[in-house]
Amino acid sequence: MTMTLHTKASGMALLHQIQANELEPLNRPQLKIPLERPLGEVYMDSSKPAVYNYPEGAAYDFNAAAPASAPVYGQSGLPYGPGSEAAAFGANGLGAFPPLNSVSPSPLVLLHPPPQPLSPFLHPHGQQVPYYLENESSGYAVREAGPPAYYRPNSDNRRQGGRERLASTSDKGSMAMESAKETRYCAVCNDYASGYHYGVWSCEGCKAFFKRSIQGHNDYMCPATNQCTIDKNRRKSCQACRLRKCYEVGMMKGGIRKDRRGGRMLKHKRQRDDGEGRNEAVPSGDMRAANLWPSPIMIKHTKKNSPVLSLTADQMISALLEAEPPIIYSEYDPTRPFSEASMMGLLTNLADRELVHMINWAKRVPGFVDLALHDQVHLLECAWLEILMIGLVWRSMEHPGKLLFAPNLLLDRNQGKCVEGMVEIFDMLLATSSRFRMMNLQGEEFVCLKSIILLNSGVYTFLSSTLRSLEEKDHIHRVLDKITDTLIHLMAKAGLTLQQQHRRLAQLLLILSHFRHMSNKGMEHLYSMKCKNVVPLYDLLLEMLDAHRLHAPANFGSAPPEDVNQSQLAPTGCTSSHSLQTYYITGEAENFPSTV
């Protein structure tokens, strides 16, 4: 068998062709070089992938054009001689390249693949060469290079490092999931909350802003329409809207935990006491929730042992009569003539002081204090004006055509005309008072109706989908049934027949719907007076007004008078279900000064 020897010129041309095919752009999907015989011993087995790469330190100018004839090789790189042609090239035209240690760095070198692929060859200008040769069973093909993978000589260490990275990743993932459960966000700007400040979860920025606003200058003006977006990035753009949102989410001046008032000694004492029961201290947010919102177990236990359900009708009547608030006198000066501002000032001042006594009255209504704090506040916010109005109508029964706001403040319809929009409300109140007078309403029936208004005001929270519903609806319904049975007992005790009892009960309960209608009218009128700055509203009255706006439908107060400055429409009081918590927690309502 004879072996054809190639000349030096043909060998050089063949090498040039291989090099040009490797470096030319990818003009066709696959380049196959037919093989006539098995590869030499330097070539790898066809079942194993072979990677063409360039050793580190090799330099090659890719921008230089390839010569037309043949590339210039150093004599030390490819020593062609008469006796070396057969050793350098095989019969198939590809032959075996010289060993790597016998040649200088060349642009084309065949390397055996290490356990991990070598890092790809870097272009002299810092760009990665996007192609390498890969051996397949069908031949050699030019493929696009993948992302760089760096070779580590010790595969065992690499596996161990992978296990450590996997373990650390899983640990970090579990820690992240654990911390995500406890992550809280600021109710004002949605930034990460630093704690429970002024009654809500808030960040340090909103906490400091609210503190400055309630302690110093807070006469902010919105340059737009009091509807600026307050978030993490835009919370400093409008101080007026930021303060408005602080009040809307429930921030309040008195929203400070009791356990913070004693200073460091109380804190250490609390931690020491907690350490006796458990190793970890209770978080501040949980302490706040435990202080303000009774746990479900405590609530269930309280409802089970609630004494109101075991009261007789006579005991219920006695308790309601004893809970009645004291008589309050107004600051009316007979020597001063009435004007719109003076009359509204008298009425709002009187209403504000009545609200304080109303809170104490509600606490003494049987079954009311058994409710969760959220339910107590919610019911008062929904019913406060109805309760004031039914008290006004009851006092005015003996004064036809007049309304007895206080023992020293008796107004008729003509005097009510000095306040714009007041006559319509006057007429409705006078008509209801006349209806009570026709029915000869008794004092025992009056206290029952007033308690029904309180407990029934927020049972159906269909006015706003953003509010949290009542937590103790079942207990409220049971107390309402108890008071209704007391009403029926009073009618039976008065000698009415069963049919008369049913008719009178229906008539009394139907009148309550008129109080709801009058209350809505009164809220709209009070809100318009606030927008026109006719009279400054007092703290508690303002809070209750803003809270009622939060509970009311979206179109409530949406059309203020045209001459109203839009900057005055922002609520300046607390407009959440936490607006009365200050009076419950600190007992401020009990110590509030009043004129009796």
Curated annotation (Swiss-Prot):
Region Interaction with AKAP13: what ranges?
Answer: 263-596
The UniProt regions of compositional bias labelled Basic and acidic residues, in chain numbering, are 155-166
Question: Which SMART domains does this one have?
Answer: HOLI (SM00430), ZnF_C4 (SM00399)
One Pfam family of this chain? Oest_recep
Q: How is it modified after translation?
A: Glycosylated; contains N-acetylglucosamine, probably O-linked. Ubiquitinated; regulated by LATS1 via DCAF1 it leads to ESR1 proteasomal degradation. Deubiquitinated by OTUB1. Ubiquitinated by STUB1/CHIP; in the CA1 hippocampal region following loss of endogenous circulating estradiol (17-beta-estradiol/E2). Ubiquitinated by UBR5, leading to its degradation: UBR5 specifically recognizes and binds ligand-bound ESR1 when it is not associated with coactivators (NCOAs). In presence of NCOAs, the UBR5-degron is not accessible, preventing its ubiquitination and degradation.
GO cellular component terms, semicolon-separated: chromatin; cytoplasm; euchromatin; Golgi apparatus; nucleus; plasma membrane; transcription regulator complex
Sites of Phosphoserine modification: 104, 106, 119, 168
KW Zinc-finger (keyword) present: yes
Which intervals of the chain are annotated as region Required for interaction with NCOA1? 36-48
Region described as Interaction with DDX5: spans on this chain: 36-175
- Which keywords does UniProt give here? Activator, Cell membrane, Cytoplasm, DNA-binding, Glycoprotein, Golgi apparatus, Lipid-binding, Lipoprotein, Membrane, Metal-binding, Methylation, Nucleus, Palmitate, Phosphoprotein, Receptor, Steroid-binding, Transcription, Transcription regulation, Ubl conjugation, Zinc, Zinc-finger
Which InterPro entries does the UniProt record give? Est_rcpt/est-rel_rcp, Estr_rcpt, Estr_rcpt_N, NHR-like_dom_sf, Nucl_hrmn_rcpt_lig-bd, Nuclear_hormone_rcpt_NR3, Nuclear_hrmn_rcpt, Oestrogen-typ_rcpt_final_C_dom
Q: Which residues carry this modification: Asymmetric dimethylarginine?
A: 261
Q: Lipidation annotated as S-palmitoyl cysteine: which positions?
A: 448
Q: Where is this region: Mediates interaction with DNTTIP2?
A: 186-311
For this protein, the DNA-binding region equals 186-251
Q: Tell me which Gene Ontology terms the entry assigns under biological process.
A: androgen metabolic process; antral ovarian follicle growth; cellular response to estradiol stimulus; cellular response to estrogen stimulus; epithelial cell development; epithelial cell proliferation involved in mammary gland duct elongation; estrogen receptor signaling pathway; fibroblast proliferation
Q: Which residues carry this modification: Phosphotyrosine?
A: 538
Q: Where is this region: Self-association?
A: 265-595
Q: In which broad location class does this protein mainly occur, judging by the first location in its UniProt entry?
A: nucleus
Q: Where is this region: Modulating (transactivation AF-1)?
A: 1-185
NR LBD domain: from which residue to which, for each copy?
A: 312-548
Fill in the subunit field for this protein: Binds DNA as a homodimer. Can form a heterodimer with ESR2. Interacts with coactivator NCOA5. Interacts with PELP1, the interaction is enhanced by 17-beta-estradiol; the interaction increases ESR1 transcriptional activity. Interacts with NCOA7; the interaction is ligand-inducible. Interacts with AKAP13, CUEDC2, HEXIM1, KDM5A, MAP1S, SMARD1, and UBE1C. Interacts with MUC1; the interaction is stimulated by 7 beta-estradiol (E2) and enhances ESR1-mediated transcription. Interacts with DNTTIP2, and UIMC1. Interacts with KMT2D/MLL2. Interacts with ATAD2; the interaction is enhanced by estradiol.
Q: What is known of its domains?
A: Composed of three domains: a modulating N-terminal domain, a DNA-binding domain and a C-terminal ligand-binding domain. The modulating domain, also known as A/B or AF-1 domain has a ligand-independent transactivation function. The C-terminus contains a ligand-dependent transactivation domain, also known as E/F or AF-2 domain which overlaps with the ligand binding domain. AF-1 and AF-2 activate transcription independently and synergistically and act in a promoter- and cell-specific manner.
Which family does the record claim for this protein? Belongs to the nuclear hormone receptor family. NR3 subfamily.
Q: What is this protein called?
A: Estrogen receptor
What gene makes this protein? Answer: ESR1
